[in-house]
Amino acid sequence: MCSPGRAPPGPAPAGDLPPEWETDDERMAFLFSAFKQSREVNSTEWDSKMAFWVGLVLARGRRRGVVRTCLRELQNGFERRGSVPLGLGTVLRELLRRGKMQRESDFMASVDSSWISWGVGVFILKPLKWTLSSVLGDSKVPEEEEVLIYVELLQEKAEEVYRLYQNSVLSSHPVVALSELRSLCAGVCPDERTFYLLLLQLQKEKKVTILEQNGEKIVKFARGLHAKVSPMNDVDIGVYQLMQSEQLLSQKVESLSQEAEKCKDDARSACRAGKKQLALRCLKSKRRTERRIEELHSKLDAVQGILDRIYASQTDQMVFNAYQAGVGALKLSMKDVTVEKAENLVDQIQELCDTQDEVAQTLAGAGVNGLEMDSEELEKELDSLLQDSAKEPVHLHPVPQKDSGFAGAISDAELEAELEKLSVCDGDLAQKTPSASSEPQTALGLNL
């Protein structure tokens, strides 16, 4: 039985259907009828019906957010008043022809992946009972149970998984466990089958590569949005093993820390109950646990130091490669440039600038005599403006007289009186504060 996803396979909500779905019975009867054997009989009706169902099928997949579907699921989803569309098989065949949809088995076969062998059990693929003749024979419709994939939606969700990884803490390492990645993508992938399809799409785009190591599958991502992933090598496997060691050591340290805290609580309880020997044993156990924690911390620091050095060396290699590329580009760009050519070019530019200045001066001198103004007339006009300015009275606001002192001055006596009031208030507050109890607390002489 086809099970494309977890979304409910029931009829589409009314808001996702066209207006004529409930109002125009005559048109819906036409749309629910089967396609003619040949488009040439009436191409206009054929194209109108095909456009209607193609849009609905693609919109339904995007609304439900699942990348897989089948003919039976679509028939149930588009059921109307007990009737199912009779031409959906032809519509799916057309979508397959256009490349909007693809058979799940064909998609898997198109990916050159060595890990599909262990993924077959997850996909639960049935024997390929259908053949090309059964699909493209007289009926020209796919099998009802055959799973189809929305190609564009699969690509978009695969890109979403890649961005999700890049924005997570897992991206600090080039290699990640498949189980950790599955947990990270739980919100994007409704089921495990979809998750593996998205990984296949990413591998098809050369953004991930997957390897099985000691019974556990690990995933390596490309280090960049447009970069291609490199094959898994010994360094990647070594880094993954170090990461696993770091994780195990961290978990062990956390567990021992909780154990040490429990020993401390037990010692405190025994101390309050007057069981001194039991309290001492609990403290000894706490000390032993703390020594084990210190040993694990030293090992954890060593592992983290190695990882830091590996990441630093990878960064140094990237910088070195960038320097090499920059030097090569600079050499190529400076291939035909010499000092002599540069000096010759500068001389030519200087000569052209001098020539341009001479031409500009020549052109400017042609109209100087006609436009030159008499300097004496300009001086007379300036004197006239100065005389007019001297005759205008200047209105200034009166300057306020400054008093020898300000009205709000405070004398020293007033300040001393205010200070005395503050001192009295502080003394009253100090008398009202209760004194701390000085009674000694009795307990066993254990340092907890």
Swiss-Prot record:
Composition skew (Pro residues), residue ranges: 1-12
Organism: Gallus gallus (Chicken)
Keyword Metal-binding applies: no
Function as written in the Swiss-Prot or TrEMBL entry: ESCRT-III-like protein required to recruit the ESCRT-III complex to the nuclear envelope (NE) during late anaphase. Together with SPAST, the ESCRT-III complex promotes NE sealing and mitotic spindle disassembly during late anaphase. Recruited to the reforming NE during anaphase by LEMD2. Plays a role in the endosomal sorting pathway.
Source species taxonomy: Eukaryota, Metazoa, Chordata, Craniata, Vertebrata
Name recorded for this polypeptide: Charged multivesicular body protein 7
Family per similarity comment: Belongs to the SNF7 family.
GO BP: any one term: nuclear membrane reassembly
Ranges where the record places region Disordered: 1-20
